[in-house]
Amino acid sequence: MARKLKIDILTLFPEMFDLFNLSMIGRAKKNGIIEINTYNIRDYTIDKHKKTDDYPYGGGAGMVMTPQPIVDSIRSVKESNKGKVIFLGPRGKKFDQEDAKKLADREELIILCGHYEGIDERVYKYIDEEYSLGDFVLTGGEMACIPIVDSICRMIPGVLSKSESYIEESFYSGLLEYPQYTRPEEFEGARVPDVLISGHHENIRKWRRKQALKITKDRRKDLFDKLVMTKEDKKLLNDNEL
């Protein structure tokens, strides 16, 4: 029986995740490979006005998400989901492909999306892991959740059309992806490289590897420096014929 991944998302804006009904993730949901549920944190508040935020103690700009509705939503979801609680916030580890692989190996996940100026510090007692997309400001955790869930789901067997698809993508192998071309062979004077239409599969493989190495070296030196170069890689970088 194929493995299934269940993701429960706690958010103030569940409608933002309707896009998971589209494209490959939508197909995976229909095929029973992935289950994605959204829960509105506002439904768990005991405030008569349905408030989920309040002014910060000590003053300061903005509003802070109150602990009660968040903690109660976590407790409720945990009745049917035993996965770890993942919070998306600025203090978290910068999310990368290795994290996507790790999370894709799990059967259940609970993702908490923050909003406003953040969450009450007392909520962290109920959080297992925290991730950030990078050193920039987003309107809310929902904006980070979408690409993170997408990167996790595409690692699940059966989500992509063929198992090789994600293996050759940028970052999975530690390299940026090689250039891609499609028809026509010539467009406004720019031709597809001859090697790609030669039919020589080994030369095509070498060309793609060389291009990936060059692009990564030029554009992401941080990734290139982490790469364990093979003898072939070193030779390809110095080969002017490919």
Curated annotation (Swiss-Prot):
Keyword annotations for this protein, in alphabetical order, are: Cytoplasm, Methyltransferase, S-adenosyl-L-methionine, Transferase, tRNA processing
Methyltransferase keyword on record: yes
Molecular functions per Gene Ontology:
tRNA (guanine(37)-N1)-methyltransferase activity
Annotated EC: 2.1.1.228
At the top level, the lineage of the source is: Bacteria
What Pfam families does this protein's entry cite? tRNA_m1G_MT (PF01746)
Q: Which Gene3D superfamilies match?
A: 3.40.1280.10, tRNA(m1g37)methyltransferase, domain 2
Q: Does the keyword Methyltransferase apply?
A: yes
Q: Name one GO cellular component term.
A: cytosol
The record's annotation in NCBIfam families points to:
PRK00026.1, trmD
Q: Which HAMAP family does UniProt cross-reference here?
A: TrmD (MF_00605)
Q: What does this protein do?
A: Specifically methylates guanosine-37 in various tRNAs.
Name of protein: tRNA (guanine-N(1)-)-methyltransferase
